[in-house]
């Protein structure tokens, strides 16, 4: 994600949650074949780490529902971290990898050990092992 961070955060949240829900529902309704083991799903997000994505407290508002306090005063990078952590904790995806990268200086980093490449690969391999057993 490289621009329009606020809009992109909302769109990526809707897409990632919706896609996971659709896949889980398709499995529950036996639309993915006869397997009794749910599909293995991973989610990868790479976000541009730049001054715009680090702005804290960008106005988050809702006309209909209260805003989760975790988002109060959060930068867009913080919001992406919250999204990816919740996708993992809620088991919407078996593996989630989050990277913040700045192509101008070549620096990339993983903001959470639980959302690292190593954990992503380990979780995918483990989940696929269940399918192969």
Describe each model-derived feature in a short phrase:
Residues 4-101:
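Acidic, metal/cofactor-coordinating or nucleic-acid-engaging core segments within structured domains
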Residues 99-133:
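Charge-rich, low-complexity intrinsically disordered segments
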Residues 1:
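A glycine-rich, hydrophobic loop/mini-helix early in the fold
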């Amino acid at each position: 994600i490289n621009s329009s961070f606020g809009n992109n955060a909302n769109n990526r949240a809707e897409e990632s949650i919706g896609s996971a829900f659709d896949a889980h529902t398709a499995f529950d309704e036996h639309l993915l074949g006869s397997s009794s083991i749910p599909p293995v799903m991973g989610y990868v997000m790479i976000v541009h780490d730049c001054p715009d994505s680090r702005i804290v407290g960008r106005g988050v508002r809702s006309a209909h529902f209260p805003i989760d306090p975790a988002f109060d005063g959060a930068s867009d990078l913080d919001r992406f971290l919250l999204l990816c952590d919740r996708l993992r904790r809620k088991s919407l995806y078996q593996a989630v990898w989050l990277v913040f990268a700045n192509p101008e200086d070549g620096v990339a980093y993983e903001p959470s050990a639980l959302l690292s490449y190593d954990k992503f690969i380990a979780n995918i391999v483990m989940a696929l092992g269940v399918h192969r057993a």
